[in-house]
Amino acid sequence: MSRYRGPRLKKIRRLGALPGLTRKTPKSGSNLKKKFHSGKKEQYRIRLQEKQKLRFHYGLTERQLLRYVHIAGKAKRSTGQVLLQLLEMRLDNTLFRLGMASTIPGARQLVNHRHILVNGRIVNIPSFRCKPRDIITTKDNQRSKDLVRNSIASSDPGKLPKHLTIDTLEYKGLVNKILDRKWVGLKINELLVVEY
């Protein structure tokens, strides 16, 4: 399966809030969940929805998600927690959480168009894994700084997780440490994803 490029509000109505996918919210009167799906949910459907939440929020393909689950399964710690740490430490997600991009697809585009430097080097791979003490900056040209300035101005500084710090004047972000489970930006039961 390829990356999802279809209507985003349909996915939000179906799966609930996905802040990484879009900032838009559906109208309060148009709740398709209550209209079509009543009664008891089956276990398979619950697990599938949790997996789809993870996929659409982080903008992953099915194969990428399976690869991350495989890597997390080899770790000695809790598989679900390691999976979330791997996904949260991706460069595109880190840019989104810093407020340098309004959505994860927007952050992915910034990285692909070579506007972002990590430790002074251009990185154009959105799945680049950030490590503690990595410094994330914008390129030194005006266009790159304008793109990031608009996103920082519209972001909420109170939502910045504890493992990241940002200098809004120099458009510079710092990864302090590896993320704790309580600072994940998505309400999800990661064990159901691993079981799926």
Curated annotation (Swiss-Prot):
Q: What range does the record give for the signal peptide?
A: none
Protein name per Swiss-Prot or TrEMBL: Small ribosomal subunit protein uS4c
Q: What does this protein do?
A: One of the primary rRNA binding proteins, it binds directly to 16S rRNA where it nucleates assembly of the body of the 30S subunit. With S5 and S12 plays an important role in translational accuracy.
| Location of region: Disordered | 16-40
Family statement: Belongs to the universal ribosomal protein uS4 family.
Q: Does the entry feature the keyword Protein transport, yes or no?
A: no
* Pfam families per UniProt: Ribosomal_S4 (PF00163), S4 (PF01479)
What do we know about how this protein assembles, alone or with others? Part of the 30S ribosomal subunit. Contacts protein S5. The interaction surface between S4 and S5 is involved in control of translational fidelity.
Keyword field: Chloroplast, Plastid, Ribonucleoprotein, Ribosomal protein, RNA-binding, rRNA-binding
Q: Is 4Fe-4S tagged as a keyword? A: no
- NCBIfam families hit by this protein: PRK05327.1, rpsD_bact
Cellular component GO terms held in the UniProt record: chloroplast; small ribosomal subunit
Q: Name one GO molecular function term.
A: structural constituent of ribosome
Q: Which gene encodes it?
A: rps4
Give the domain of life.
Eukaryota
The protein's location, in the record's own words, is: Plastid, Chloroplast
The S4 RNA-binding domain extends over 89-152
Q: Which SUPFAM superfamilies match?
A: Alpha-L RNA-binding motif
Q: List the disulfide bonds.
A: none
CDD domains, A to Z: S4
Q: Name one GO biological process term.
A: translation
Q: Matching InterPro entries, A to Z?
A: Ribosomal_uS4 (IPR022801), Ribosomal_uS4_bac-type (IPR005709), Ribosomal_uS4_CS (IPR018079), Ribosomal_uS4_N (IPR001912), S4_RNA-bd (IPR002942), S4_RNA-bd_sf (IPR036986)
